[in-house]
């Protein structure tokens, strides 16, 4: 498992794994859901960045961050490491407001 992997959950949701690779030995992961952009409102641009996954636009709904058991995560679809500053920035907005 790698930080910023995009995965399906056992319930069919799409999530970004935001947990540090240094903590990969844990049996849980901090994830943020990716919700279809045409169905969910962007509350704040820095809090809710947009990503295109397999030709579809998704909103990172940072305010819905949660932990899931590793067993609830499916195969890796892609990795968003190239967007790490945007993802970490969204988490910073959630935690610090900045």
Regions inferred by a protein language model and the residue ranges of each:
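Residues at structural and domain junctions
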Residues: 1, 17, 73-77
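C-terminal terminal-subdomain/extension
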Residues: 54-98
């Amino acid at each position: 498992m790698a930080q910023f992997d995009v995965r399906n959950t056992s319930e069919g949701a799409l999530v970004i794994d935001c947990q540090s690779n240094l903590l990969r030995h844990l049996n849980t992961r901090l994830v943020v859901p990716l919700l279809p952009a045409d169905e969910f409102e962007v509350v704040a641009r820095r809090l809710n960045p947009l990503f295109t996954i397999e030709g579809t636009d998704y909103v990172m709904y940072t305010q819905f961050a949660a932990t899931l058991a590793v067993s609830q995560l499916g195969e890796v679809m892609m990795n968003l490491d190239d967007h790490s500053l945007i993802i970490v920035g969204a988490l910073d907005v959630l935690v610090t407001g900045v």
